[in-house]
Amino acid sequence: MKTLLLTLVVVTIMCLDLGYTTKCYVTPDVTSQTCPDGQNICYTETWCDAWCGSRGKRVNLGCAATCPKVNPGVDIICCSTDNCNPFPKRS
């Protein structure tokens, strides 16, 4: 019985993964960084500026506590797994 209890405790601790923090790509360097405590959402924000036709959309990557508010003309994609927000490929 003690062995079963010990096994359940070990499995519970492994499943809880206490202290886990998300890693997201962050601009301007597009490097993977550990997000601060409480910020478990990765986001990719894209928008066009005056030079969008020649150089493509502007991109902002980062961590957030909640998915950022969507504004007109701005596309936001949010996700919650490690490095799920890579720099978008130009089309």
Swiss-Prot record:
GO CC, one annotated term: extracellular region
Keyword Secreted among UniProt keywords: yes
Signal peptide residue numbers: 1-21
Alphabetic keyword roster: Acetylcholine receptor inhibiting toxin, Disulfide bond, Ion channel impairing toxin, Neurotoxin, Postsynaptic neurotoxin, Secreted, Signal, Toxin
PROSITE patterns found in the cross-reference section: SNAKE_TOXIN
Expression by tissue: Expressed by the venom gland.
Gene3D superfamilies: CD59 (2.10.60.10)
Record's subcellular location: Secreted
SUPFAM superfamilies reported for this sequence: Snake toxin-like (SSF57302)
Disulfide bridge map: 24-42, 35-63, 48-52, 67-78, 79-84
MF-aspect GO terms: acetylcholine receptor inhibitor activity; ion channel regulator activity; toxin activity
InterPro entries, per database record: Snake_3FTx, Snake_toxin-like_sf, Snake_toxin_con_site, Toxin_cobra-type
Task of the protein: Binds with high affinity to muscular (alpha-1/CHRNA1) and neuronal (alpha-7/CHRNA7) nicotinic acetylcholine receptor (nAChR) and inhibits acetylcholine from binding to the receptor, thereby impairing neuromuscular and neuronal transmission.
Family: Belongs to the three-finger toxin family. Long-chain subfamily. Type II alpha-neurotoxin sub-subfamily.
Protein name, UniProt field: Long neurotoxin OH-56
Organism: Ophiophagus hannah (King cobra)
